[in-house]
């Protein structure tokens, strides 16, 4: 049924005609997410008619069908103006039972009405900055969190819980003030941690939770993880007190469980991704819960520590490395978590090094060539995205105990140069972190070839032919002067800039490097002091 015909039916004021028209329109457009521009004005007219009645109040028997029509129209981004007034948003909040102030529309406990209203609000908040502002001003997050807090005591339909959480996610993703309000005023981390515990089936009695999460629980858990990520992204900074640390460690144990279980359907990797993203927001000292599981018969044990979680994160990393797009979002969070675990815990670092950087045997292949995990990570070290190459290089550097020679050995100087330059370690240096002395066992193959390995490429290379063979001394001098002239021209035209190494290990212009070196020599020479 066309929107013009529905609008004309609504204008008749005849109840049966109106409801039949709306019912027909809803059935025809239930799966419509794109709309014909030619009918845009008709849809706006219909939206205005629906909103005017919505704000005045609907009879209980008409609410679901009426709200379904509003939901369909709210998908059209060009038709949102009638729905984004303070009065219409207040009416929808009342029907969703999340209004903090009493409106002219009576609250409804009908879960079908609540669900349709929540869907309408989600559409509006997603697409309209005005609706986002009005929802924040109306403090919808307050009543939403109140209802979320009742999930343990009362039974709510899955869809209502899901869209409660989805609306929370949208509000916290799009409004900084709502993020802060949920984090600070409403104690959102504790509330949502309890809700996640309930959703995962973790019981206070310590009974083992299910290892396969059903599909509905998976959907809700992912929304909870996304909201928690939003509110902790910028809020957890520096040191936390003992009470907060205990809360984050408890959350960490739940996230540890998340990365160890599978989900119904094909959403396991997506679910693990949200858990890993949130792990990256936790205070660093709370990540120790990833290594506190007691070893058991089927666990991966290393140096007396259960490495099941670290192994699961490595498997997840390998899956993400197969992706060719959005690598920053795919691999940066898990690499950051693994890096911090390796930095703080020697058993984790040694286990990861054994898996990622096993003793070198193949010394004739460049480090970035191949399908081993080491090869894939070294390739990332020269990725166009600076964040991707930074986290990949940082991870491998920590696995090498921040030893520059060891890092170059496994990656090649050419690949390592970016991180070394950023840290002022181009000329070598000592690591910043506190690392115990780890032995780096060289294989016989590496020992035999070590003297022939090109440190820049990280592999044994055939000696190239001498390009000056057969030239006279005059010809060699002529070619050398041509080269000097070419470099001088490139330098004068600022195509290239000659670089040198400063005494502090940083790359700098050659002129500045020479000046800095001379200044240091003069300052250290006792004969240079004034008389």
Curated annotation (Swiss-Prot):
SUPFAM superfamilies for this protein: ARM repeat
Highest taxon of the lineage: Eukaryota
Cellular location(s): Cytoplasm, Cell cortex; Cytoplasm
Processing after translation: Phosphorylated at Ser-436 and Thr-441 by CK2, stabilizing its interface with G alpha proteins.
GO molecular function term, any single one: protein folding chaperone
Keywords on record: Chaperone, Cytoplasm, Guanine-nucleotide releasing factor, Phosphoprotein
Function statement: Chaperone that specifically binds and folds nascent G alpha proteins prior to G protein heterotrimer formation, promoting their stability and activity: folds GNAI1, GNAO1, GNA13 and GNAQ. Does not fold G(s) G-alpha proteins GNAS nor GNAL. Also acts as a guanine nucleotide exchange factor (GEF) for G alpha proteins by stimulating exchange of bound GDP for free GTP.
Name of the protein in its database record: Chaperone Ric-8A
Organism: Homo sapiens
Phylogenetic lineage: Eukaryota, Metazoa, Chordata, Craniata, Vertebrata
């Amino acid at each position: 049924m066309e929107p013009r015909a529905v609008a004309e039916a609504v204008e008749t004021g005849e109840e049966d005609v109106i409801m039949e028209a709306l019912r027909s329109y809803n059935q025809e457009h239930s799966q419509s997410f794109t709309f014909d521009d030619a009918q845009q004005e008709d849809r706006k007219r219909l939206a205005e008619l629906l909103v005017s009645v919505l704000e005045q109040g609907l009879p209980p028997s008409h609410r679901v069908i009426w709200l379904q029509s509003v939901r369909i129209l709210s998908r059209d981004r060009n038709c949102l103006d009638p729905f984004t007034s303070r009065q219409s948003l207040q009416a929808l909040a009342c029907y969703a039972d999340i209004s903090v102030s009493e409106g002219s529309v009576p609250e409804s406990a009908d879960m079908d009405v609540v669900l349709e209203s929540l869907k309408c609000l989600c559409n509006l908040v997603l697409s309209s900055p005005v609706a986002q502002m009005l929802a924040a001003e109306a403090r919808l997050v307050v009543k939403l969190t109140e209802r979320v807090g009742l999930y343990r005591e009362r039974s709510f339909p899955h869809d209502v819980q899901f869209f409660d959480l989805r609306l929370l996610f949208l509000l916290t993703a799009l409004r900084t003030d709502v993020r802060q309000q949920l984090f600070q005023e409403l104690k959102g981390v504790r509330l949502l941690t309890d809700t996640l515990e309930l959703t995962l089936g973790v019981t206070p009695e310590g009974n083992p939770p299910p290892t396969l999460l059903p599909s509905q629980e998976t959907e809700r858990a992912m929304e909870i993880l996304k909201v928690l990520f939003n509110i902790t992204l910028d809020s957890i900074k520096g040191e936390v007190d003992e009470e907060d640390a205990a809360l984050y460690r408890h959350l960490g144990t739940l996230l540890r469980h998340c990365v160890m279980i599978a989900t119904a359907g094909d959403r396991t990797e997506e679910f693990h991704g949200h858990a890993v993203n949130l792990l990256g927001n936790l205070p660093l000292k709370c990540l120790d819960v990833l290594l506190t599981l007691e070893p058991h018969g089927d666990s991966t044990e290393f140096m007396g520590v259960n490495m099941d979680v670290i192994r699961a994160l490595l498997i997840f990393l390998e899956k993400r490395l197969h992706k060719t797009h959005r690598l920053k979002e795919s691999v940066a969070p898990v690499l950051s978590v693994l890096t911090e675990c390796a930095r703080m815990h020697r058993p984790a670092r040694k286990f990861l090094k054994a898996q990622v950087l096993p003793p070198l045997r193949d010394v004739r292949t460049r480090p970035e060539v191949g399908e081993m995990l080491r090869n894939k990570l070294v390739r990332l070290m020269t990725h166009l995205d600076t964040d991707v190459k930074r986290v990949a290089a940082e991870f491998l550097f920590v696995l090498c105990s921040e030893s520059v020679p060891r890092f170059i050995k496994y990656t090649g100087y050419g690949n390592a140069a970016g991180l070394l330059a950023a840290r002022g370690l181009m000329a070598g240096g000592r690591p910043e972190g506190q690392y115990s002395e780890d032995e780096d066992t060289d294989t016989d193959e590496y020992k035999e070839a070590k003297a022939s390995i090109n440190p820049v490429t990280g592999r044994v290379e055939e000696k190239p032919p001498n390009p000056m063979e057969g030239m006279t001394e005059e010809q060699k001098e002529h070619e050398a002067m041509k080269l000097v002239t070419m470099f001088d021209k490139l330098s004068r035209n600022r195509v290239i800039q000659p670089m040198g190494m400063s005494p502090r290990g940083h790359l700098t212009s050659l002129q500045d490097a020479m000046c800095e070196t001379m200044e240091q020599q003069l300052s250290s020479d006792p004969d240079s002091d004034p008389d």
